C-alpha cells in the first residue's frame, strides 16, 4: 500500500515515526508531508525521514484561507500522483478535504479535546477517527477509542529508553530541579483559552522555585535576557520527557 503521514507540529513527528518504520518493514511505501513549524523539519532530518513541505500560513485570516486552498490543491495533486491508499494524520483540514475529493481513506488520530471540538466538521469527513478513552464528548457514533495516549507511540517501554538526565542537564546527580514550560498560545486551538503567565508572573515563578532547586525553562518563545540563562539546553532529538524520568 501507499501510505501518507502528515505532520503539523514537531510532536507529531514523534507520534508517527515508529509507525512509519513498522509499515516500511512490511514493505509498504510511506510518504511524509509536513508544515515547516518550529523544529519539525529538523527532527525529520535527524531521523532521516524524507518529506515534502506544505505551505505555512501567516496569522491573519486571509493568509490562512489562502494557504488552506493552496495546500488542498497541492495535496490533491500529491495524492493522485503517488496513488496514495491511506492518509494518517492528526486533525488536518488540508488532508481531510483532499482525501475526500480523491477518494483516499483517511485516518485521524487526535488527543487534544478542545481542538477536536473545533474541528469536528473535518472529523466527520474522515473514514476513521481514533481518540483516547478519556474524551468527555463524542466526535461521531463510529469513533474508535483506546486506553492510553498518543505519547505511548514513542514513550512505551518497548520503544523508549531514557538517557541519563544528569548528563543531559550537565549537572550533578541528585540535584533537585524543576522544568518550567512556556508555550506560545498562538495555535488555532488556543484562541479561546486563557493565555498563560504574564512576563512578570514568569519571573516570579522562576524566582520562587530557584530558592529551593535549580530551574530549567523549556520555551517556545524568546525569553527576556534575565530568563534566557535558565533555558534548558538539550539536543533537539532528545525528548523533554527524558529529563522528567527518574534516573
Identify the function of each model-found stretch:
Residues 71-79, 221-247:
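Donor nucleotide-activated moiety binding/catalytic core segment of transferases
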Residues 47-51, 57-58, 206-234:
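Catalytic donor nucleotide-activated moiety binding site of glycosyltransferases and closely related
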Residues 130-197:
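A nucleotide-sugar donor-handling region in carbohydrate enzymes
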Residues 87-98, 108, 236-247:
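A donor-sugar binding/catalytic signature common to diverse glycosyltransferases
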Amino acid at each position: 500500500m501507499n501510505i501518507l503521514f502528515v505532520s503539523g507540529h514537531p510532536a507529531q513527528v514523534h507520534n508517527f515515526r515508529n509507525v512509519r518504520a513498522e509499515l516500511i518493514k512490511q514493505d509498504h511505501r510511506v510518504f511524509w508531508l509536513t508544515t515547516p513549524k518550529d523544529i519539525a523539519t529538523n527532527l525529520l532530518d535527524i531521523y532521516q525521514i524524507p518529506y515534502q513541505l506544505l505551505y505555512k500560513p501567516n496569522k491573519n485570516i486571509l493568509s490562512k484561507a489562502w494557504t488552506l486552498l493552496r495546500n488542498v490543491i497541492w495535496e490533491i495533486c500529491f495524492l493522485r500522483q503517488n496513488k496514495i491508499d491511506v492518509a494518517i494524520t492528526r486533525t488536518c483540514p488540508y488532508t481531510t478535504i483532499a482525501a475526500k475529493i480523491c477518494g483516499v481513506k483517511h485516518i485521524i488520530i487526535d488527543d487534544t479535546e478542545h481542538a477536536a471540538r473545533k474541528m469536528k466538521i473535518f472529523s466527520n469527513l474522515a473514514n476513521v477517527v481514533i481518540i483516547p478513552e478519556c474524551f468527555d464528548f463524542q466526535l461521531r457514533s463510529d469513533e474508535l477509542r483506546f486506553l492510553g495516549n498518543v505519547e505511548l507511540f514513542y514513550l512505551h517501554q518497548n520503544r523508549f529508553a531514557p538517557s541519563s538526565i544528569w548528563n543531559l542537564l550537565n549537572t550533578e546527580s541528585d540535584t533537585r530541579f524543576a522544568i518550567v514550560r512556556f508555550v506560545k498560545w498562538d495555535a488555532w486551538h488556543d484562541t479561546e483559552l486563557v493565555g498563560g503567565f504574564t512576563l512578570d508572573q514568569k519571573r516570579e515563578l522562576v524566582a520562587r522555585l530557584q530558592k529551593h532547586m535549580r530551574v530549567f525553562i523549556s520555551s517556545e518563545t524568546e525569553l527576556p535576557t534575565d530568563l534566557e540563562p535558565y533555558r534548558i539546553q538539550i539536543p533537539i532529538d532528545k525528548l523533554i520527557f527524558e529529563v522528567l524520568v527518574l534516573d
